[in-house]
Amino acid sequence: MTHDELVLKILGDALPGAVEETADFRGERTIFVRKDKVKDVCRLLRDDPALKYSFLSDISADDYLPDYPRFAVNYHLLSMANKHRLRLRVWVEDPDDGPETMADIWPIATWLEMEVWDLMGVRFAGNGSLRRLFLPEDWQGHPLRKDYPLGYEEVQFSFNWQEIDAKKPYAKE
């Protein structure tokens, strides 16, 4: 039995119905987990002596606009004892109703969830530390969302340099 098969067997026996589906891509297994069961799954993966996923290496989020559910939250786990990586994916329909915080399982999750909220706007229930981490406190919106308005400065070339130069706010004496 492979390690991936062992993970699925343990999850299926201990938490029936928690796993929605699985996918393999480039040698990495992704397990799609129900949002209401993800905390139980994470605790089991960490505490089971055969699995020992003791390291949460990252939490990320994807925006699938215009698809529904729009957001996916990804938990990247590492079992150092078994030298094995695993990704859990949770679908999130409403970013204000995201999954529960994992901070009581892995303390680093507080910061990782803060990053996901700052850039993508997905809230984690029970995380009282959600605040701006990378962006200024007065920033409006979440810039990694697909519907975030793009802003840019026009590139200056030889054919348009006078037009661009005239728009720049140079210091006045």
Q: How should each PLM-predicted stretch be described?
A:
Residues 1-173:
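Terminal low-complexity/charged segments
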